[in-house]
Protein backbone atom coordinates (compact mmCIF):
# COMPACT_ATOMS: atom_id res chain seq x y z
CA UNK A 1 0.00 0.00 0.00
CA UNK A 2 1.37 3.42 -0.97
CA UNK A 3 1.85 6.03 1.71
CA UNK A 4 0.84 9.66 1.14
CA UNK A 5 4.36 10.73 0.16
CA UNK A 6 4.56 8.01 -2.50
CA UNK A 7 1.18 9.00 -3.90
CA UNK A 8 2.25 12.63 -4.20
CA UNK A 9 5.56 11.59 -5.78
CA UNK A 10 3.73 9.60 -8.47
CA UNK A 11 1.57 12.61 -9.31
CA UNK A 12 4.65 14.85 -9.38
CA UNK A 13 6.48 12.49 -11.73
CA UNK A 14 3.50 12.49 -14.09
CA UNK A 15 3.29 16.30 -14.27
CA UNK A 16 5.75 16.79 -17.19
CA UNK A 17 3.76 14.32 -19.28
CA UNK A 18 0.45 15.98 -18.36
CA UNK A 19 1.89 19.34 -19.44
CA UNK A 20 3.34 17.91 -22.64
CA UNK A 21 0.19 16.14 -23.81
CA UNK A 22 -2.46 18.61 -22.60
CA UNK A 23 -4.63 19.52 -25.58
CA UNK A 24 -3.08 16.79 -27.75
CA UNK A 25 -4.99 13.92 -29.34
CA UNK A 26 -4.53 10.22 -28.64
CA UNK A 27 -6.19 7.46 -30.63
CA UNK A 28 -6.61 4.25 -28.65
CA UNK A 29 -7.45 0.96 -30.31
CA UNK A 30 -9.24 -1.05 -27.66
CA UNK A 31 -9.20 -4.82 -28.02
CA UNK A 32 -7.86 -8.10 -26.71
CA UNK A 33 -8.39 -9.58 -23.26
CA UNK A 34 -9.05 -6.13 -21.81
CA UNK A 35 -12.42 -6.34 -23.56
CA UNK A 36 -13.33 -9.70 -22.00
CA UNK A 37 -12.23 -9.16 -18.41
CA UNK A 38 -14.70 -6.97 -16.50
CA UNK A 39 -12.06 -5.72 -14.05
CA UNK A 40 -9.55 -4.83 -16.77
CA UNK A 41 -12.30 -3.14 -18.75
CA UNK A 42 -13.10 -0.95 -15.75
CA UNK A 43 -9.44 0.07 -15.46
CA UNK A 44 -9.24 1.00 -19.14
CA UNK A 45 -12.39 3.10 -18.73
CA UNK A 46 -10.83 4.81 -15.68
CA UNK A 47 -7.66 5.54 -17.66
CA UNK A 48 -9.56 7.03 -20.60
CA UNK A 49 -11.65 9.25 -18.34
CA UNK A 50 -8.57 10.35 -16.39
CA UNK A 51 -6.80 11.33 -19.62
CA UNK A 52 -9.86 13.26 -20.74
CA UNK A 53 -10.17 15.08 -17.41
CA UNK A 54 -6.54 16.30 -17.59
CA UNK A 55 -7.15 17.83 -21.00
CA UNK A 56 -6.02 15.09 -23.38
CA UNK A 57 -8.35 14.42 -26.30
CA UNK A 58 -9.07 10.71 -26.64
CA UNK A 59 -10.61 8.81 -29.54
CA UNK A 60 -11.42 5.13 -28.99
CA UNK A 61 -11.59 2.69 -31.90
CA UNK A 62 -12.65 -0.85 -31.12
CA UNK A 63 -13.05 -4.20 -32.71
CA UNK A 64 -14.53 -7.10 -30.82
CA UNK A 65 -12.86 -10.27 -32.01
CA UNK A 66 -13.59 -12.40 -28.92
CA UNK A 67 -17.26 -11.40 -28.91
CA UNK A 68 -17.59 -11.95 -32.66
CA UNK A 69 -16.06 -15.41 -32.34
CA UNK A 70 -18.42 -16.21 -29.45
CA UNK A 71 -21.50 -15.34 -31.47
CA UNK A 72 -20.21 -17.07 -34.60
CA UNK A 73 -19.86 -20.21 -32.51
CA UNK A 74 -23.47 -19.84 -31.35
CA UNK A 75 -24.68 -20.00 -34.96
CA UNK A 76 -22.16 -22.68 -36.03
CA UNK A 77 -20.00 -20.47 -38.25
CA UNK A 78 -16.27 -21.18 -38.15
CA UNK A 79 -14.11 -18.00 -37.93
CA UNK A 80 -11.57 -17.67 -40.75
CA UNK A 81 -8.45 -15.51 -40.92
CA UNK A 82 -5.85 -14.58 -43.54
CA UNK A 83 -2.59 -12.99 -42.32
CA UNK A 84 -4.30 -11.88 -39.14
CA UNK A 85 -7.28 -10.35 -40.99
CA UNK A 86 -10.76 -11.81 -40.50
CA UNK A 87 -12.35 -13.25 -43.66
CA UNK A 88 -15.98 -12.06 -43.67
CA UNK A 89 -18.70 -13.77 -45.72
CA UNK A 90 -22.26 -12.41 -45.95
CA UNK A 91 -23.60 -14.20 -42.86
CA UNK A 92 -20.54 -13.25 -40.83
CA UNK A 93 -20.86 -9.61 -41.93
CA UNK A 94 -24.40 -9.33 -40.62
CA UNK A 95 -23.36 -10.77 -37.27
CA UNK A 96 -20.21 -8.62 -37.09
CA UNK A 97 -22.23 -5.44 -37.55
CA UNK A 98 -24.78 -6.47 -34.94
CA UNK A 99 -22.10 -7.35 -32.39
CA UNK A 100 -19.73 -4.41 -32.96
CA UNK A 101 -22.24 -1.61 -33.48
CA UNK A 102 -25.21 -2.86 -31.48
CA UNK A 103 -23.48 -4.53 -28.55
CA UNK A 104 -19.78 -3.74 -28.04
CA UNK A 105 -20.00 -0.06 -28.97
CA UNK A 106 -23.01 0.66 -26.81
CA UNK A 107 -21.58 -1.26 -23.86
CA UNK A 108 -18.43 0.89 -23.98
CA UNK A 109 -20.42 4.11 -24.29
CA UNK A 110 -22.60 3.10 -21.34
CA UNK A 111 -19.57 2.32 -19.16
CA UNK A 112 -17.91 5.64 -19.97
CA UNK A 113 -21.11 7.57 -19.38
CA UNK A 114 -21.62 6.09 -15.92
CA UNK A 115 -18.96 8.52 -14.74
CA UNK A 116 -19.37 11.21 -17.38
CA UNK A 117 -21.64 12.39 -20.15
CA UNK A 118 -18.79 12.50 -22.62
CA UNK A 119 -18.89 9.32 -24.73
CA UNK A 120 -20.56 9.27 -28.14
CA UNK A 121 -20.85 6.00 -30.06
CA UNK A 122 -20.19 5.89 -33.79
CA UNK A 123 -19.39 3.45 -36.55
CA UNK A 124 -17.55 4.20 -39.75
CA UNK A 125 -20.97 4.62 -41.37
CA UNK A 126 -21.91 7.68 -39.31
CA UNK A 127 -21.36 10.89 -41.28
CA UNK A 128 -19.37 8.67 -43.68
CA UNK A 129 -16.55 8.82 -41.15
CA UNK A 130 -14.87 5.89 -42.91
CA UNK A 131 -15.51 4.98 -46.54
CA UNK A 132 -14.60 1.35 -47.16
CA UNK A 133 -13.52 -0.72 -50.12
CA UNK A 134 -12.96 -4.45 -50.45
CA UNK A 135 -9.78 -5.95 -49.03
CA UNK A 136 -10.28 -8.90 -51.40
CA UNK A 137 -11.75 -7.32 -54.58
CA UNK A 138 -11.45 -10.57 -56.56
CA UNK A 139 -13.63 -12.47 -54.09
CA UNK A 140 -17.39 -11.92 -54.40
CA UNK A 141 -18.63 -13.22 -51.05
CA UNK A 142 -16.01 -11.54 -48.89
CA UNK A 143 -16.94 -8.41 -46.98
CA UNK A 144 -13.61 -7.83 -45.30
CA UNK A 145 -12.81 -4.22 -46.05
CA UNK A 146 -10.05 -1.66 -45.92
CA UNK A 147 -10.07 2.08 -45.35
CA UNK A 148 -10.55 3.93 -48.62
CA UNK A 149 -11.16 7.40 -47.18
CA UNK A 150 -11.68 9.13 -43.84
CA UNK A 151 -14.01 12.11 -43.42
CA UNK A 152 -12.77 13.31 -40.07
CA UNK A 153 -15.12 16.30 -39.56
CA UNK A 154 -17.53 14.51 -37.19
CA UNK A 155 -14.64 13.42 -34.94
CA UNK A 156 -13.17 16.93 -34.89
CA UNK A 157 -16.59 18.34 -34.02
CA UNK A 158 -16.98 15.95 -31.08
CA UNK A 159 -13.43 16.49 -29.79
CA UNK A 160 -13.75 20.27 -29.97
CA UNK A 161 -16.91 20.01 -27.85
CA UNK A 162 -15.20 17.89 -25.19
CA UNK A 163 -16.66 14.51 -26.15
CA UNK A 164 -14.96 11.11 -26.42
CA UNK A 165 -15.76 9.48 -29.78
CA UNK A 166 -16.10 5.68 -29.58
CA UNK A 167 -15.82 4.19 -33.07
CA UNK A 168 -16.81 0.68 -34.19
CA UNK A 169 -14.77 -0.62 -37.13
CA UNK A 170 -17.68 -1.21 -39.52
CA UNK A 171 -18.07 1.00 -42.60
CA UNK A 172 -19.76 1.15 -46.01
CA UNK A 173 -18.46 1.64 -49.52
CA UNK A 174 -19.83 4.31 -51.86
CA UNK A 175 -22.69 1.97 -52.82
CA UNK A 176 -23.75 1.37 -49.22
CA UNK A 177 -22.30 -2.14 -48.92
CA UNK A 178 -21.18 -2.81 -45.34
CA UNK A 179 -17.65 -4.03 -44.65
CA UNK A 180 -15.83 -5.32 -41.59
CA UNK A 181 -12.50 -3.50 -41.31
CA UNK A 182 -9.59 -4.43 -39.08
CA UNK A 183 -9.86 -2.08 -36.09
CA UNK A 184 -6.11 -1.46 -36.00
CA UNK A 185 -6.30 -0.10 -39.55
CA UNK A 186 -9.26 2.13 -38.72
CA UNK A 187 -7.47 3.48 -35.64
CA UNK A 188 -4.33 4.18 -37.65
CA UNK A 189 -6.22 5.96 -40.42
CA UNK A 190 -8.13 8.14 -37.94
CA UNK A 191 -4.92 8.95 -36.05
CA UNK A 192 -3.28 9.95 -39.31
CA UNK A 193 -6.15 12.29 -40.27
CA UNK A 194 -6.11 13.88 -36.82
CA UNK A 195 -2.31 14.31 -36.80
CA UNK A 196 -2.54 12.59 -33.43
CA UNK A 197 0.23 12.75 -30.89
CA UNK A 198 -0.01 9.01 -30.27
CA UNK A 199 -1.64 5.90 -31.69
CA UNK A 200 -1.94 3.25 -28.98
CA UNK A 201 -2.88 -0.35 -29.70
CA UNK A 202 -4.02 -2.44 -26.73
CA UNK A 203 -3.13 -6.09 -27.33
CA UNK A 204 -2.67 -9.38 -25.49
CA UNK A 205 1.14 -9.24 -25.66
CA UNK A 206 3.69 -6.99 -23.92
CA UNK A 207 4.59 -5.46 -27.29
CA UNK A 208 7.04 -6.48 -29.98
CA UNK A 209 9.39 -9.17 -28.74
CA UNK A 210 12.46 -10.71 -30.35
CA UNK A 211 11.22 -14.05 -28.94
CA UNK A 212 7.43 -14.31 -28.81
CA UNK A 213 7.70 -16.87 -26.00
CA UNK A 214 9.86 -14.65 -23.80
CA UNK A 215 8.26 -11.45 -22.41
CA UNK A 216 11.69 -10.29 -21.23
CA UNK A 217 12.70 -9.95 -24.90
CA UNK A 218 10.38 -6.95 -25.28
CA UNK A 219 11.86 -4.30 -27.57
CA UNK A 220 11.02 -0.92 -26.04
CA UNK A 221 11.89 1.40 -28.93
CA UNK A 222 11.89 0.71 -32.67
CA UNK A 223 12.00 2.77 -35.83
CA UNK A 224 10.46 1.85 -39.17
CA UNK A 225 13.60 0.31 -40.64
CA UNK A 226 13.94 -1.96 -37.60
CA UNK A 227 10.29 -2.98 -37.92
CA UNK A 228 10.76 -3.88 -41.59
CA UNK A 229 13.81 -5.95 -40.68
CA UNK A 230 11.87 -7.87 -38.02
CA UNK A 231 9.12 -8.54 -40.57
CA UNK A 232 11.62 -9.87 -43.09
CA UNK A 233 13.09 -12.13 -40.39
CA UNK A 234 9.56 -13.38 -39.63
CA UNK A 235 9.87 -12.29 -36.02
CA UNK A 236 6.78 -10.16 -36.58
CA UNK A 237 4.10 -12.65 -37.67
CA UNK A 238 0.36 -13.30 -37.93
CA UNK A 239 -1.93 -10.84 -36.21
CA UNK A 240 1.00 -8.58 -35.33
CA UNK A 241 1.56 -7.80 -39.04
CA UNK A 242 -1.53 -5.59 -39.57
CA UNK A 243 -0.84 -3.88 -36.24
CA UNK A 244 2.70 -2.98 -37.23
CA UNK A 245 1.67 -2.01 -40.76
CA UNK A 246 -1.00 0.40 -39.53
CA UNK A 247 1.53 1.91 -37.09
CA UNK A 248 4.06 2.43 -39.89
CA UNK A 249 1.46 4.11 -42.10
CA UNK A 250 0.36 6.35 -39.22
CA UNK A 251 3.95 7.37 -38.46
CA UNK A 252 4.50 8.22 -42.11
CA UNK A 253 1.33 10.31 -41.91
CA UNK A 254 2.67 12.59 -39.14
CA UNK A 255 1.52 10.69 -36.04
CA UNK A 256 4.34 11.39 -33.58
CA UNK A 257 4.58 7.89 -32.10
CA UNK A 258 2.76 4.58 -32.07
CA UNK A 259 2.62 2.19 -29.13
CA UNK A 260 1.81 -1.50 -28.88
CA UNK A 261 1.07 -2.39 -25.26
CA UNK A 262 -0.42 -5.12 -23.11
CA UNK A 263 -4.00 -4.24 -22.26
CA UNK A 264 -4.09 -6.91 -19.55
CA UNK A 265 -1.81 -4.77 -17.36
CA UNK A 266 -3.81 -2.72 -14.87
CA UNK A 267 -3.83 0.97 -15.87
CA UNK A 268 -1.82 0.15 -19.00
CA UNK A 269 -2.68 3.44 -20.71
CA UNK A 270 -1.56 5.65 -17.83
CA UNK A 271 1.65 3.66 -17.40
CA UNK A 272 2.51 4.04 -21.08
CA UNK A 273 1.57 7.70 -21.46
CA UNK A 274 2.41 9.29 -18.10
CA UNK A 275 5.65 7.52 -17.12
CA UNK A 276 9.13 7.68 -18.62
CA UNK A 277 9.61 3.90 -18.68
CA UNK A 278 6.30 2.95 -20.28
CA UNK A 279 5.26 -0.69 -20.47
CA UNK A 280 5.23 -1.63 -24.15
CA UNK A 281 6.89 -0.98 -27.51
CA UNK A 282 7.14 2.61 -28.75
CA UNK A 283 7.44 2.97 -32.53
CA UNK A 284 8.82 6.06 -34.25
CA UNK A 285 9.99 7.13 -37.69
UniProtKB/Swiss-Prot annotation:
Stored SUPFAM superfamilies: Carbamate kinase-like
Give GO cellular component annotations, separated by semicolons: chloroplast
Q: Which residues are noted in the entry as substrate-binding?
A: 64-65, 86, 180
Any idea which GO molecular function terms this record carries? acetylglutamate kinase activity; ATP binding
Per the record, what are the reactions this protein catalyses? N-acetyl-L-glutamate + ATP = N-acetyl-L-glutamyl 5-phosphate + ADP
Site positions for Transition state stabilizer:
29, 243
Top EC class, one word: transferase
Query: Disulphide bridges in this chain?
Result: none
Q: What is its EC number?
A: 2.7.2.8
Q: Name one GO biological process term.
A: L-arginine biosynthetic process
Pathway the protein takes part in: Amino-acid biosynthesis; L-arginine biosynthesis; N(2)-acetyl-L-ornithine from L-glutamate: step 2/4
Name the keywords, alphabetized.
Amino-acid biosynthesis, Arginine biosynthesis, ATP-binding, Chloroplast, Kinase, Nucleotide-binding, Plastid, Transferase
Q: Where in the cell is it found?
A: Plastid, Chloroplast
Entry annotated with the keyword Cell inner membrane? no
Coiled-coil positions are none
The UniProt function text for this chain reads: Catalyzes the ATP-dependent phosphorylation of N-acetyl-L-glutamate.
Into which family does the record put it? Belongs to the acetylglutamate kinase family. ArgB subfamily.
Q: What is this protein called?
A: Acetylglutamate kinase
Q: Which organism is it from?
A: Gracilaria tenuistipitata var. liui (Red alga)
Amino acid sequence: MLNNFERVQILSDALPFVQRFHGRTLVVKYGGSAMKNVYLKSKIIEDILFLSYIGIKVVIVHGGGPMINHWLKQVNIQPKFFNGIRVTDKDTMELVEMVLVGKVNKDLVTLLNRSSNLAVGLSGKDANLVVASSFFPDQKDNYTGKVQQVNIEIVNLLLSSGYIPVVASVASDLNGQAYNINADSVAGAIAECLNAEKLILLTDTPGIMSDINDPSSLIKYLNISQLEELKSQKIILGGMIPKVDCCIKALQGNVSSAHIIDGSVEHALLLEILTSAGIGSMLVL
